[in-house]
Curated annotation (Swiss-Prot):
Mg(2+) binds at D70, E140. Allosterically activated by GTP, when glutamine is the substrate; GTP has no effect on the reaction when ammonia is the substrate. The allosteric effector GTP functions by stabilizing the protein conformation that binds the tetrahedral intermediate(s) formed during glutamine hydrolysis. Inhibited by the product CTP, via allosteric rather than competitive inhibition. This is CTP synthase. It comes from Methanosarcina mazei (strain ATCC BAA-159 / DSM 3647 / Goe1 / Go1 / JCM 11833 / OCM 88) (Methanosarcina frisia). ATP binds at G13, L14, G15, K16, G17, I18, D70.
Length: 534
């Protein structure tokens, strides 16, 4: 097994995840099987109970793992499926070590950070890498060098560097290069960051610099000199027009070739597929506008996978999608804001929790339904579409979800039976892959091209089966089901009115878009052309 370990310095949020994903993509383009592990030094077991304002969206894996959004980037770039074990947290490590201590696995010994915690970290890394069957395992250590939380993980990979043959492991350090008022790039923070890393016994073979503009030759020379790395291994990861251009950006600087040389991997022929996809993305001329009506609109990372899936749909339809975030509560406060939705070619209601903003979202759904604007609802978006339909079409006044109103006379959305009495919040929802059978001749079947699908889920509430027949008698169709669970709702005769209990965005890939997003953008393009003719 070959390991590529990526650390970060100067500050967090530099883009280590995109760096890892881009390196992995380039190695995959050369014919190698690649997997990736994200190490998060927080004490949480997983990301499931974190606010989107803390870490952005919670990405859901096929096995139900609720993880950091970086793993979503890994899956999209590498076109692979990961598991919950690919996300190692301090919480998981300590939980396992304490469980072993209680079982008596360390009987007679004092349990310590070294060797017990560090050994557990190494064991987790090696087990995941081995099970994946990959040629190369990429490891991202979250946070910044110098953070107290990261120390056990840095010590663990230091030990791995000592234990593995030198041709089996390489260290990459990602740092920030800032510019002063005169535009000169300053390398001191990078130098100090590498110095701090070396004090921990780690010497990076490659330095990747994040900057607004391409790294100047003088700055590259200075970093190479003071950080003791060859100049050709100081890589500029400057801001790109789109994250999917980053693999090409670092490939052109020879990083993949240098890594393969260090790891003694035979050079393969690039199939060119990624480059072609990026070229298609950049050559789009048509443009449509999409409104995402949500409650976490101040932080776009809250809806990262949705934004990427929309982009994938745009690439496939040779159309650029301009996305505007609309705060749901503003629609509740001023109906004039609702009318402004007519400027959009499509409306999307994403998933979420809690009652804040739900009435505003339903106003947006009603506007889309009545004005036949292409609409996509996801998870909570589907539940609200059903509530809106129940109230305004099926004459079920004050219909609601028991999540928001336990005393509603028409609980068209109710808690999952197995969730009743569940007290713990973490990892207890209906999570991960579940299948659905699609109704023959439905729009959903046409969209997917099959009557059997598997998609990822994250929810506690569902459409109440007691109201399905009554709602369908008024025209809505539940065209996808998992046994007696409603997975898809659609309204026939509309340009595009599709809502899913599952999260299709989590399985969307560049070059292979999720069918609902591909269909939404296609409908938006058609709607835009119809409006232009009028």
């Amino acid at each position: 097994m070959k390991y590529i370990v990526v650390t970060g310095g100067v500050m967090s949020g530099l883009g280590k995840g995109i760096t890892i994903a881009s390196i992995g993509r380039n190695l995959k383009n050369k014919g190698y099987k690649v997997t990736a592990i994200k190490i998060d030094p927080y004490i949480n077991i997983d990301a499931g109970t974190m606010s989107p304002y803390q870490h952005g969206e919670v990405f859901v894996l096929r096995d139900g793992g609720e993880v950091d959004l970086d793993l979503g980037n890994y899956e999209r770039f590498l076109d692979t499926e990961l598991t919950r074990d690919h996300n190692i947290t301090t919480g998981k490590v300590y939980q396992e070590v304490i469980a072993k201590e209680r079982r008596g696995d360390y009987l007679g010994k004092t349990v310590q950070i070294i060797p017990h915690i560090t050994n557990e970290i190494k064991n987790k890394i090696r087990k995941v890498a081995a099970r994946s069957g990959a040629d190369v395992c990429l490891i991202e250590i979250g946070g910044t060098v110098g953070d107290i939380e990261s120390m056990p993980f840095l010590e663990a990979v230091r030990q791995m560097h000592r234990e593995e043959p030198s041709e089996n492991i390489v260290f990459i350090h990602v740092t920030l290069v800032m510019e002063d008022l005169q535009g000169e790039q300053k390398t001191k923070p990078t130098q100090h960051s590498v110095k701090e890393l070396r004090a921990l016994g780690l010497s990076p073979e490659v330095i990747v610099t994040r900057s607004k503009t391409p790294l100047q030759e003088s700055a590259k020379e200075k970093i190479a000199l003071f950080c003791d790395v060859p100049q050709e291994l100081v890589i500029s990861a400057h801001d790109a027009g789109d994250i999917y251009e980053v693999p090409l950006e670092i490939e052109e600087q020879g990083l993949t070739t240098q890594l393969m040389k260090h790891l003694r991997l035979e050079s393969g022929v690039d199939d060119g597929g990624w480059r072609e996809m990026v070229a298609r993305m950049k050559s789009t001329t048509d443009e449509v506008k999409l409104a995402i009506v949500g409650k976490y609109t101040n932080l776009e990372d809250s809806y990262l996978s949705i934004l990427e899936a929309v982009k994938h749909g745009g690439i496939d339809n040779a159309c650029r999608v301009e996305v505007n975030m609309v705060e749901a509560e503003t629609l509740e406060e001023d109906l004039v804001e609702v009318e402004k939705l007519k400027q959009y070619d499509g409306i999307l209601i994403p998933g979420g929790f809690g009652g804040r903003g739900t009435e505003g979202k339903m106003l947006a759904i009603k506007f889309a339904r009545e004005n036949d604007i292409p609409f996509l609802g996801i998870c909570l978006g589907m539940q609200l579409a059903v509530i809106e339909f129940a109230r305004n079409v099926a004459n079920l006044e004050n219909a609601n979800s028991t999540e928001f109103d336990e005393d509603t006379p028409y609980p068209v959305i109710d808690i999952l039976p197995e969730q009743t009495g569940v007290a713990d919040m973490g990892g207890t929802m209906r999570l991960g892959d579940y299948d659905a059978i699609l109704k023959e001749g439905s729009f959903a079947t046409k969209l997917y091209g099959t009557n059997y699908i598997v998609e990822r889920h994250r929810h506690r509430y569902e459409v109440n089966p007691e109201f399905v027949d009554r709602l369908e008698s008024f025209g809505i169709v539940f065209s996808g089901k998992n046994k007696n669970r409603m997975e898809i709702a659609e309204i026939p005769g509309k340009r595009f009115f599709f809502a899913s209990q599952f999260h299709p965005e989590f399985k969307s890939r560049p070059g292979r878009p999720s069918p609902p997003f591909k269909g939404l953008v296609r409908a938006m393009c058609k709607y835009r052309k119809e409006r232009e003719v009028q």
